[in-house]
Amino acid sequence: GKRSPSGKLPVSFPKSVGQLPLFYSDRTSGRPGNDRYVSMDGQPLFPFGYGLSYTTFAFGKIHINKNSLSAGEKVTLHIPIKNIGDRDGVEVVQIYIQRQADKEGPVKTLRAFKRVEIPKGKTQEVKIELPYVAFEWFDPTTNTMRPIQGEYNILYGNSSRMKDLQSAKIQIQ
């Protein structure tokens, strides 16, 4: 126990088989349906990016070097993280992008991450740069991936679960 585990899940683990995608490769049995798929809350048992540790980390308020981003530019994020546990530990800072106006695309997408070692009781400021292309989204009018103008959320935290994430806004030109 001298080292604290720091691995993160590369997939989500569902709570129930009802959360898995439906496949129609087999004929139906003809029995009455008794699945609870519709009544489930949709939250996985363990979300993508989740991990265990023997210590605890607190994410501070993000500082972004600009509120608006144009082609060819990059935005720099500064995120303070404090190890509030009793042991030295490693945390993986995860950065997700969410396009507010998109009702058909993904809820959020992982665009950056950084592994940091933080001694117990210490705060470390993590610096992550996102280039303009990190804000690419599918454009159905051109059938291409490209940065689409509008307001985006930068979500940051230690897993993909919304309650584990904090957010800041940025305008893409």
Report each predicted region and the residues it spans.
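Generic structural detector for well-ordered beta-strands
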Residues: 58, 63, 80, 112-119, ...
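Terminal connector regions
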Residues: 131-173
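Intrinsic-disorder/low-complexity, polar/charged segments enriched in Ser/Thr/Lys/Arg/Asp/Glu/Gln
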Residues: 74-76, 123-127, 165-167
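Intrinsically disordered, low-complexity Pro/Gly/Ser/Thr-rich segments with frequent PxxP/GP/PP motifs
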Residues: 102-140
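Short acidic, flexible loop segments centered on an aromatic residue
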Residues: 86-103, 108-110
